[in-house]
């Protein structure tokens, strides 16, 4: 009997694209940002990464705050750092709320359905591992018609730890101790590095990174 093969996917950013979030900023503020010499895509990334960082640290502090709430105060920071004298006058609260709510509408990354189909055809069992809240991320998968069974969907809140704590990845590896292959797929370098240290073979940025125990 052939040894089992498993691949664990990060979800938001890896299987689910940030495009809806980026498009919301472009739609409501793109022209205005360009008029002040601020590249919209740079601003989008600053807001996204700033919000994600604040959310991560709030989880570590055991005071988790949803991204959609965290993004509102974070939104004004890169505006101020870009030279906008009155960030709260530069953009209306309604625009910030619209952008924050767009994070609920994230869709599938192009090619992910074919990717998972080919993996299954080659004998892989697909798992999801997310640091996002379970209901929201499962909602993304359902809306995008990405089929990952509920028993294969693991949220960090179910483990009692958060990425990139080693306990998260060790928890996953314990689910298939006799696997012939265990892979981890993520677009975030910090996530991939933590998985590698825990014993996974990585797939990230189109490169295979050797397993190291």
Predicted regions and their residues:
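Asp-based, Mg2+/Mn2+-dependent phosphohydrolase catalytic module
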Residues: 1-7, 113, 117-120, 129, ...
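Active-site neighborhood of HAD-like aspartate-dependent phosphohydrolases
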Residues: 2-49
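Active-site loop signature of alpha/beta-hydrolase-fold enzymes
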Residues: 14, 109, 210
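Alpha-helical elements of Rossmann-like donor-binding domains used by nucleotide-donor carbohydrate transfer enzymes
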Residues: 24-28, 46, 73-77, 98, ...
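Short helix-capping segments at alpha-helix termini
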Residues: 31-38, 81-89, 145-149, 177
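Residues at secondary-structure transition points
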Residues: 38, 62-66, 159, 163
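A metal-dependent, Asp-based hydrolase signature
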Residues: 41, 46, 52-97
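Short, acidic loop-to-helix structural element flanking the phosphoryl-transfer center
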Residues: 64, 68-69, 87-127
């Amino acid at each position: 009997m052939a040894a089992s093969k498993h691949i664990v996917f990060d979800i938001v950013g890896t299987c689910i694209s940030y495009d809806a979030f980026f498009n919301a900023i472009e739609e409501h503020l793109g022209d205005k940002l360009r008029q002040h010499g601020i590249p919209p895509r740079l601003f989008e990334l600053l807001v996204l990464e700033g919000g994600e960082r604040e959310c991560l640290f709030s989880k570590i502090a055991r005071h988790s705050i949803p991204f959609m709430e965290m993004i509102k105060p974070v939104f004004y920071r890169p505006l101020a750092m870009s030279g906008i004298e009155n960030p709260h006058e530069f953009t209306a609260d309604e625009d910030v709320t619209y952008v924050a709510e767009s994070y609920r509408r994230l869709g599938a990354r192009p090619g992910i359905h074919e990717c998972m189909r080919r993996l299954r055809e080659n004998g892989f069992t697909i798992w999801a591992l997310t640091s996002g809240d379970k209901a929201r991320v499962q909602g993304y998968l359902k809306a995008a018609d990405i089929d990952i069974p509920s028993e294969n969907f693991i949220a960090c809140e179910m483990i009692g730890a958060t990425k990139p704590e080693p306990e998260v990845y060790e928890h996953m590896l314990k689910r298939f101790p006799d696997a012939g292959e265990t892979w981890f797929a993520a677009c975030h370098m910090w996530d991939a590095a933590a998985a590698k240290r825990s014993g996974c073979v990585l797939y990230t940025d189109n490169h295979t990174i050797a397993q190291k125990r």
